């Protein structure tokens, strides 16, 4: 699912970019740009161009993915793809043993995924990104937490992260008809936060000595 062809179009015209890839990969990129799909005797893939909220309905519910990666702009910049309604549709196509992965550590996103029945884990920060307490989120439908091993790059949410899900930051983005504008989605959430009795996010930050820079969307 992708709304904008321009990045791929630009990349295919950029010789420096193309030199980074094997000719076979370049062929796949070109086919996805011109035909929206690629297939040979070993591999096939496709891309649905347009508003993801509309295009996701094209994917049959019978198709289940082992891996779903959410790489949209942050919830504040592009809330349309982080709403409880859209994520509900996304998770319907997740294999029961599959993984949903995103760079986002947003409390709203994590709480939504948990409310949709997924187990939530945090991606351990790399050394170079130590100022951030998480590099993202892994969500799994069925996973025995007791099987987590030290060499995994994800782990249970810390107490600090769990408490983040009890603040106003965890209030979800909503888009009931999957056609709302960015501004409308954000406004509705702000209104809901205003009247919520949940702990303020500032209080949570103060308790844990956090700054806005260390809290990723």
What are these regions (language model features)?
Residues 67-69, 96-104:
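Conserved beta-strand signature within the Rossmann-like core of class I S-adenosyl-L-methionine
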Residues 1-5:
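Conserved acidic E/D residue at the C-terminus of a beta-strand in Rossmann-like folds
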Residues 80-96:
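A short glycine-rich, Lys/Arg-flanked "PGG" loop and its adjoining helix->strand segment in the class I
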Residues 110-135:
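Conserved Class I S-adenosyl-L-methionine
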Residues 39-40, 137-217:
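SAM/dcSAM-binding transferase cores
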Residues 45, 63-72:
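Short SAM/SAH-binding signature in class I
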Residues 69-81:
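Glycine-rich phosphate-binding "P-loop"
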Residues 10-60:
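S-adenosyl-L-methionine
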């Amino acid at each position: 699912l992708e709304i904008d062809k321009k990045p791929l179009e630009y990349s295919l015209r950029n010789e420096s970019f193309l030199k980074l890839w094997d000719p076979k990969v370049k062929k796949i990129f070109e086919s996805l740009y011109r035909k929206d799909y690629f297939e040979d005797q070993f591999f096939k893939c496709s891309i649905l161009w347009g508003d993801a909220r509309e295009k996701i309905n094209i994917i049959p519910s019978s198709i289940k993915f082992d891996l779903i990666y959410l790489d949209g702009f942050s919830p504040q910049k592009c809330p349309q793809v982080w709403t409880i309604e859209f994520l509900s549709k996304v998770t319907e196509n997740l294999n029961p043993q599959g993984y949903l992965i995103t760079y986002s550590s947003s409390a709203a996103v994590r709480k939504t995924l948990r409310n949709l029945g997924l187990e939530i884990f945090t991606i351990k920060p790399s050394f170079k990104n130590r100022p951030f307490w998480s590099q993202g989120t892994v969500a799994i439908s069925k996973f025995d937490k007791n099987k987590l091993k030290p060499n995994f790059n994800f782990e249970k949410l810390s107490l600090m992260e769990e408490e983040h899900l009890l603040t106003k930051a965890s209030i979800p983005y909503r888009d009931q008809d999957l056609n709302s504008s960015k501004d409308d989605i954000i406004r509705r959430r702000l209104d809901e936060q205003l009247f919520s009795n949940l702990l303020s996010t500032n209080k949570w930050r103060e308790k844990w000595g956090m700054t806005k820079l260390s809290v990723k969307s």
